């Protein structure tokens, strides 16, 4: 199956100053595009950039929030990956991005965390070898991105698939001309701590994060301030992944009909609170954080992830 990117829906162009800019984000699983880069992808797309998200697996090893689709998990029906395609398409539509799967949908399987038996599955992404890099070279050659976004060498929090996404991104980028900058999505320690401190009461059944429990970085090379429109798009793209994410703003869905409410003391630091299936309360911050992984440095007055690039 071809890896060709497909347009997933219309988008609203607010400004056209980034027309001609081509951006590719390489992510491990459905929902990563929303959690780590949703604001930047929407920011770029609504300013006219051509934005594509390459997703490497279907996220088959994920747990499920809510009772509705619990039996889709890998230990039961093993149908979660197909369901998450639908969630991803909804998220990309909200962000205004195109999407494709590395090697085609289902070629590579979610490896799970270190030590998970899924590491040994024959289609496990950690076992993808040279083929995955070749597939990404094909995509980069076709799309000719100026800007590429992925994770750092640790994958952000140590997940083997995130680390593998980093490896193939840098390997492929070194073989394709025209890529001017690679960014690594990270979580800035200062903003994260401020957001966690602002959460005064977590929803019933949730818990507060322990000290240093959530992965974060001291080094931030660029922080993107999300305006109201970009922030709203990020939250809604996260909400689209309802099997994986729970937004504590009272919203419900067919997937998760249970409302959750969090209380915060500083809405600038934590306007919205969410949790993964571990039910650890986290802030959706007003800034996204990035490290420069390779290529053109940011100008001192940079306000956008493509500032300083030429196209």
From Swiss-Prot:
- Family assignment from sequence similarity: Belongs to the MshB deacetylase family.
Q: EC number(s) in its UniProt entry? A: 3.5.1.103
Ranked from the top, the taxonomy reads: Bacteria, Bacillati, Actinomycetota, Actinomycetes, Mycobacteriales
Q: Where does Zn(2+) bind?
A: 29, 32, 162
Q: Record's Gene3D superfamilies?
A: LmbE-like
Query: What does the record list as GO biological process?
Result: mycothiol biosynthetic process
This chain's function reads: Catalyzes the deacetylation of 1D-myo-inositol 2-acetamido-2-deoxy-alpha-D-glucopyranoside (GlcNAc-Ins) in the mycothiol biosynthesis pathway.
Q: Which gene encodes it?
A: mshB
What this protein catalyses is: 1D-myo-inositol 2-acetamido-2-deoxy-alpha-D-glucopyranoside + H2O = 1D-myo-inositol 2-amino-2-deoxy-alpha-D-glucopyranoside + acetate
Q: Which residues form the signal peptide?
A: none
GO MF entry, a single one? N-acetylglucosaminylinositol deacetylase activity
Q: What is this protein called?
A: 1D-myo-inositol 2-acetamido-2-deoxy-alpha-D-glucopyranoside deacetylase
Cofactor(s) the protein needs: Zn(2+)
Q: Which UniProt keywords apply?
A: Hydrolase, Metal-binding, Zinc
Cofactor info, note text: Binds 1 zinc ion per subunit.
């Amino acid at each position: 199956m071809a890896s060709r990117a497909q347009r997933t829906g219309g988008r609203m162009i607010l400004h056209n100053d980034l027309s001609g800019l081509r951006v590719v984000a390489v992510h491990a699983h459905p929902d990563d595009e929303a959690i780590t880069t949703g604001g930047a992808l929407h920011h770029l797309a609504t300013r006219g950039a051509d934005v594509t998200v390459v997703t490497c697996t279907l996220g088959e090893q994920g747990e499920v929030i809510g009772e509705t689709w619990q039996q889709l998990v890998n230990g039961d029906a093993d149908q979660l990956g197909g369901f998450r395609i639908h969630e991803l398409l909804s998220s990309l539509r909200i962000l205004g991005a195109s999407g494709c799967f590395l090697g085609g949908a289902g070629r590579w399987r979610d490896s799970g965390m270190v030590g998970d038996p899924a590491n040994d599955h024959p289609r496990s992404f950690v076992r993808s070898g040279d083929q995955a890099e070749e597939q990404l070279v094909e995509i980069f050659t076709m799309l000719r991105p100026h800007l590429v976004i992925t994770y750092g060498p640790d994958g952000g929090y140590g997940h083997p698939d995130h680390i593998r996404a980093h490896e193939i991104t840098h390997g492929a980028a070194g073989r394709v001309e025209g890529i001017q900058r690679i960014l690594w999505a990270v979580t800035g320690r200062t903003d994260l701590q401020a957001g966690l401190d602002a959460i005064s009461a977590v929803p019933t059944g949730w818990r507060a994060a322990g000290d240093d429990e959530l992965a974060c970085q001291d080094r931030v090379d660029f922080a993107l301030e999300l305006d109201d429109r970009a922030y709203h798009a990020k939250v809604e793209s996260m909400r689209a992944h309802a099997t994986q994410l729970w937004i504590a703003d009272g919203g419900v869905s067919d997937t998760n009909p249970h409302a959750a409410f969090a209380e915060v003391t500083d809405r600038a630091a934590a306007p919205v609170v969410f949790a993964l299936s571990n039910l650890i309360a986290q802030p959706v911050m007003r800034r996204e954080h990035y490290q420069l992984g390779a290529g053109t440095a940011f100008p001192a007055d940079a306000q956008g992830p493509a500032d300083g690039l030429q196209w």
